[in-house]
Regions:
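Non-catalytic tandem-repeat scaffold regions and their flanking low-complexity/translocation tails
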Residues: 1-303
Length: 303
């Protein structure tokens, strides 16, 4: 559809189906990846042209998919020399903006495709980026793709271990541990049969300094699952509250709400659902912290 009718038509169709089909809700982020890949090919790998047609719907997957195509077109022989310039346009337009973030994160997805899902080789590609902020966002794309690729029939991930659920986070350098743990909970939750209480328990045992981000990651998963389940409004807030309240450690519950709020904004590209969740919290300190996170993340996305 992108080639024949354009990016906007493809998104209009996707948004229409999103309201009707549970499969589309569950797979929406990956579907927007496909639109982004096609758009990048249509615009000859030009990042500004591709981004000008973009849409943040379903977690900005369009931009991540676009970068997968851009990296693939550059190729392994040239990518390390050119990587630092790939995100130059969004960086110069507004450093650390949402477009800049999506570009750097998308590069991580692209490196995984280019290097056959080799996590550590892809992280070495992220290492060539001169900005620490870009390296962090790039690594997040690597770890996200690694978890997604568990179900890749043609090239499943080699860097996931059921008996070591937080691998490879345990083995990557400190700079990349937080981006890893916040995404690895998706895999851990799946392996635990969506038992949120069990994953809270496992997060409580990870290495010192990274338990809070593990709880945030689980909050992301709670919000994502609520969307996939088709819950909305008060039912969605109730589902998220119920799951996050399973945390037993002092910091577990509020950090779970932080992750859920950020993911709701990420998924819907607005703060309606996030604020509804915050307002539903009965503890005043949690409610205030929740609303503050919502405001800060919305401001971050508007940069």
């Amino acid at each position: 559809m992108v080639y024949n009718s354009g990016v906007q038509a493809a998104f209009a169709d996707l948004k229409d189906e999103f309201t009707k089909e549970q499969f589309v809700k569950a797979s929406c982020h990956q579907l927007t990846h496909s639109i982004g890949r096609a758009a990048a090919e249509l615009y000859g790998g030009d990042v500004p042209s591709t981004y000008s047609q973009g849409d943040d719907f379903c977690g900005s997957g369009y931009y991540h998919g676009a970068m997968q195509s851009v990296v693939a077109n550059i190729g392994a022989d040239k990518i390390l020399d050119e990587a630092d310039n790939i995100c130059a346009a969004p960086r110069e337009q507004q450093d650390q903006s949402l477009d800049h973030r999506n570009c750097a994160h998308g590069m991580g997805h692209g490196f995984m495709g280019l290097y056959g899902n080799e996590v550590f080789e892809s992280l070495e590609a992220c290492d060539v980026l001169s900005e620490g902020w870009e390296r962090e966002k790039c690594s997040g794309g690597v770890f996200m793709e690694n978890v997604i690729d568990e179900d890749n029939p043609s090239n499943p991930s080699k860097y996931l271990k059921a008996d070591e659920p937080f691998y490879p986070c345990t083995e990557v350098k400190s700079e990349y541990k937080s981006p890893c743990y916040v995404r690895q909970t998706n895999y851990v939750l799946k392996k635990q049969g969506d038992d949120f209480a069990k994953v809270f328990e496992l997060c409580g045992k990870v290495e010192d300094g990274f338990r809070p981000i593990c709880y945030v990651g689980l909050g992301n998963n709670v919000a994502t699952q609520s969307t996939k389940n088709g819950t909305t409004g008060g039912d969605q807030a109730e589902f998220i509250r119920g799951a996050c309240m399973l945390g037993q450690e002092t910091e577990a519950r509020p950090k779970c709400f932080v992750g859920a709020v950020r993911q709701l904004i990420f998924n819907y590209d607005n703060d309606v659902q996030a604020k509804a969740l915050c307002e539903s919290l009965t503890r005043a300190d949690w409610r205030a912290a929740c609303l503050q996170v919502s405001e800060e993340y919305m401001a971050e996305r508007r940069r």
